[in-house]
Amino acid sequence: MRGKIKILDIETGNLAIFINPEDAEQWRIHPNDLVKIESGKRYIYGSAFIGNIVEKGEIGISKDVLSIHQFSNGEIVSLSPAGTPESVKYIKKKMRGEKLKKVEIETIVRDIVDRKLRNTEISAFVSAIEINGLDMEEIAALTIAMAETGDMLDIERKPIMDIHSIGGVPGNKTNVIVVPIVAAAGLTIPKTSSRAITSAAGTADVVEVLTNVTLTLEEIKRIVEKIGACLVWGGALNLAPADDLMIHVERRLSLDPRGLMLASIMAKKYAIGSQYILIDIPTGKGAKVESMEEARSLARDFIELGKRLGQYVEVAITYGGQPIGYTVGPALEAKEALETLMTGRGPGSLVEKAIGLAGLLLEMGGAAPKGKGKIIAREILEKGKAYQKMREIIEEQGGDPDIKPEDIPIGDKTYTIHAQTNGYVTAIDNRGITAIAREAGAPEDKGAGIRLHVKVGDKVKEGDPLFTIHAESESRLDKAIVLARRLEPIKIEGMVLQVIENL
């Protein structure tokens, strides 16, 4: 069938293609059938919607379709039934618990990227992996397929270093300090980061307070070849595009299969050509990984997968039992990170973690002798070399290199929670702190978040400030206050827990 494109001012949440009932009957197209639109070398798959919203001879497309391929009103295109994708039988194979071959995994990933598979089929694939798992051979094949169906970055400056934290700990602005330290030592580190999904700030959200993070692959290549580093948002790039489509389904199902998590992280590293990768696994109560046993098991998987991909991987299991530094939220974290870079000093939890991780990367890349990386990383930070490199990164990405911490606007609607008793801080609930910061507006409102006044082990008196909530609107602040009072994320106890009387 050939017809004229009609752009419809609607969003459906999927790739909807609207067909007049007469055309649908003539071409034997049924509701929700997979159909293909072609125009020259451009093509897209979508679900058929039958209705009189379009006239006979018209093919209606939603805004969702336009977000992937640009078609113009009145453009002549061809439309045809697509049939059942070949990959569906491979998904059924995994549902039966059978091992998938490399070519079968490649077919599934290609069909996901081409949008031949809808959310129902992708959900079945994700669920099959959750139930039956993937072995390391399958994970490696999936990783490579995810990377090679997207764009690949070719950087000539070697060696190429990379770092990734699996997250789960609020206030983790560590990589904003690690990256300039590593680059200042002469190594290459093109860091792509995510925005917050369930946290109060992703690395990209924090860096965006200081400079532009939405760059093209060509711009990244130019910057990295020139200064050895970047701090950009990976979501603006076509890196491992199947990953985003699968993550969308995982979130809806509240699933996070280990095999997919490993492939998701390593596919993006493979796509940008990372040779030496440090994985940070924060571990502790309230973190994504709560036990050392689970952390060690995950570490072994990362190392084994790296070997299969030709990448050298080391894993740092770090303390994740409370927030890193004293701030949570994009602007608050950017301010704290910039202060640390400018002065070479900062909260112990932030500085020690940053130089510890940076030191490992220096040793991995040959910029420091074994066992001396942390010392050299500290020196680079304290002598201002990391700050100078951060200025270069900010400027090359389109920001003002002269930005100062006091230039960063923070939410001016504030409320401070105080201690109700004397004692010691025995625990800070990571999930509670994150929930309150998000209720205050983070990460969408850059100035929203939480400033902690105490950490675990601190002695407090009744009336002492525990944390301050920052928001950009009174309504957001009020909601955050209600949640803070309900959750009580900071626990205070006396040294004497109970007295047993001699009766």
From Swiss-Prot:
GO terms for cellular component: cytosol. AMP binds at G168, S194, R195, A196, I197, T198, S199, T203, S264, K288. GO terms for biological process: AMP catabolic process; pyrimidine deoxyribonucleoside metabolic process; pyrimidine nucleobase metabolic process. It catalyses: AMP + phosphate = alpha-D-ribose 1,5-bisphosphate + adenine; CMP + phosphate = cytosine + alpha-D-ribose 1,5-bisphosphate; UMP + phosphate = alpha-D-ribose 1,5-bisphosphate + uracil. One of its GO terms (molecular function) is pentosyltransferase activity. Keywords: Glycosyltransferase, Transferase. It comes from the Archaea. The keyword Glycosyltransferase applies. Its EC number is 2.4.2.57. The active site is at D256 (proton donor). InterPro entries: AMP_phosphorylase (IPR017713), Asp_de-COase-like_dom_sf (IPR009010), Glycosyl_Trfase_fam3 (IPR000312), Glycosyl_Trfase_fam3_N_dom (IPR017459), Glycosyl_Trfase_fam3_N_dom_sf (IPR036320), Nuc_phospho_transferase (IPR035902), PYNP-like_C_sf (IPR036566), PYNP_C (IPR013102). Pfam families: Glycos_trans_3N (PF02885), Glycos_transf_3 (PF00591), PYNP_C (PF07831). The keyword Transferase applies. Belongs to the thymidine/pyrimidine-nucleoside phosphorylase family. Type 2 subfamily. NCBIfam families: AMP_phos, ARCH_P_rylase, PRK04350.1. Catalyzes the conversion of AMP and phosphate to adenine and ribose 1,5-bisphosphate (R15P). Exhibits phosphorylase activity toward CMP and UMP in addition to AMP. Functions in an archaeal AMP degradation pathway, together with R15P isomerase and RubisCO. PANTHER family: THYMIDINE PHOSPHORYLASE. This is AMP phosphorylase.
